[in-house]
């Protein structure tokens, strides 16, 4: 009789990256963003493989302390036991040195925190050690494609890091004079896009609705009239945004909070967003073969402007499984629960092949 085969041992390898972050006192906004960045595969690898060490820029304001503490924290999140939780207190010390607005234990806005953090990390691993003087030469005589390339080159002569490689795209702004028809264009780098949420009387609001509202042609009239450089006068104009260069990582900010001076309020509209195959070609400023994105992380805000709580839903770059990160508590979740009316920041990764310049 043939010998019985020994059962194949189940893999004992633990999927790492499922470690929680302790709440130091209203620091859930920080924990949510840190977990989203920890699951950004290329940024994670940059920290885990110590690639950042060769890029550290000692000319930076913080002398590389912020990047070093961030990398240390990412390494802890990926080497600790899934049942453990890590204290981000050393990291918090450095981020509040870099951005004093985060001193103390008040609740903060996660999108603002992300902006400050990425800016700080970028500065400390900027490959440009000595920035050239800003070039004031006008590029208005050039065709748009060439103008955008030149503007991007000028940007990279001053800002060039592994962080900006991942997160920075280029936005095109077109201003058309209704008197003479002249169209002026500007090309600006962006780290994220803040999307208005449309008010609908019926039917669900989708992420594409938000993007279409963001890129919709706006009329600038009355006090908003700009000066047309051809008419040499303030004229009624139309303004439109489009995406010139798609970033590797696209962060979409759903504008849930009003900026009213007297009393802030929050929109709890459910926005339906795709988990994969978000095709953004219709928002490209030039013909584009590929601009398809897949979701891998969401920063959520529950509650009101007066009292709320941040969590993160992240898809592991190793197992492709979704987990909920609620400060020190990490639990598996179904992908069908990722969409909710608490979604605030959406992290998408560009699927290959890339259409970037």
Swiss-Prot record:
A biological process term (GO) from this entry: protein deubiquitination
Domain USP: 19-351
This protein's UniProt keywords: Biological rhythms, Cytoplasm, Hydrolase, Metal-binding, Protease, Thiol protease, Ubl conjugation pathway, Zinc
GO annotations of cellular component type: cytoplasm; perinuclear region of cytoplasm
Pfam family, one: UCH
Annotated Zn(2+) binding sites: 177, 180, 228, 231
InterPro entries with a match to the protein in the record: Papain-like_cys_pep_sf, Peptidase_C19_UCH, Ub_carboxyl-term_hydrolase, USP_CS, USP_dom
Native organism: Gallus gallus (Chicken)
Protein's recorded name: Ubiquitin carboxyl-terminal hydrolase 2
E.C. number: 3.4.19.12
Subunit structure of this chain's protein: Homooligomer.
Subcellular location: Cytoplasm; Cytoplasm, Perinuclear region
Function: Hydrolase that deubiquitinates polyubiquitinated target proteins such as MDM2, MDM4 and CCND1. Possesses both ubiquitin-specific peptidase and isopeptidase activities. May play a role in the regulation of the circadian clock.
Family designation: Belongs to the peptidase C19 family. USP2 subfamily.
UniProt GO MF annotations: cysteine-type deubiquitinase activity; metal ion binding
């Amino acid at each position: 009789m043939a010998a019985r085969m020994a059962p194949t041992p189940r893999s004992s390898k633990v999927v790492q990256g499922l470690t929680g972050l302790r709440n130091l006192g209203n620091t859930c906004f920080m924990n949510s963003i840190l977990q989203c960045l920890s699951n950004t595969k290329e940024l994670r690898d940059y920290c885990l493989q110590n690639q950042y060490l060769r890029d550290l820029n000692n000319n930076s304001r913080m002398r590389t302390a912020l990047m070093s503490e961030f990398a240390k924290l990412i390494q802890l999140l990926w080497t600790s036991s899934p049942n453990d939780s890590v204290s981000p207190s050393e990291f918090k010390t450095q981020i509040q040195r870099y951005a004093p607005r985060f001193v103390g234990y008040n609740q903060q806005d996660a999108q603002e925190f992300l902006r400050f953090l990425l800016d700080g990390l970028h500065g400390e691993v900027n490959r440009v050690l000595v920035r050239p003087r800003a070039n004031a030469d006008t590029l208005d005589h050039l065709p748009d494609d060439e103008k955008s390339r030149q503007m991007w080159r000028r940007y990279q002569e001053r800002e060039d890091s592994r962080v900006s490689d991942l997160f920075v795209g280029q936005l095109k702004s077109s201003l058309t004079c209704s008197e003479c028809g002249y169209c002026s264009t500007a090309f600006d780098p962006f780290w994220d896009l803040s999307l208005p949420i449309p008010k609908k009387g019926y039917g669900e609001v989708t992420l594409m609705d938000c993007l279409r509202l963001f890129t919709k042609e706006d009329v600038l009239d009355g006090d908003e009239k700009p000066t047309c450089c051809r008419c040499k006068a303030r004229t009624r104009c139309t303004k439109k945004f489009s995406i010139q260069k798609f970033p590797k990582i696209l962060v979409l900010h759903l504008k849930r909070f009003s900026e009213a001076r007297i009393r802030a309020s929050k929109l709890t509209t459910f926005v339906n967003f795709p988990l994969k195959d978000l095709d953004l070609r219709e928002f490209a400023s030039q013909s584009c073969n590929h601009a398809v994105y897949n979701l891998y992380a969401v920063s959520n805000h529950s509650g009101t402007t007066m009292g709320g709580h941040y969590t993160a839903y992240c898809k592991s770059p190793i197992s492709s499984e979704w987990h909920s990160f609620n400060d020190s508590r990490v639990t598996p979740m179904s992908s069908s629960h990722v969409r909710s009316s608490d979604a605030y920041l959406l992290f998408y990764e560009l699927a290959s092949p890339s259409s970037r310049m």
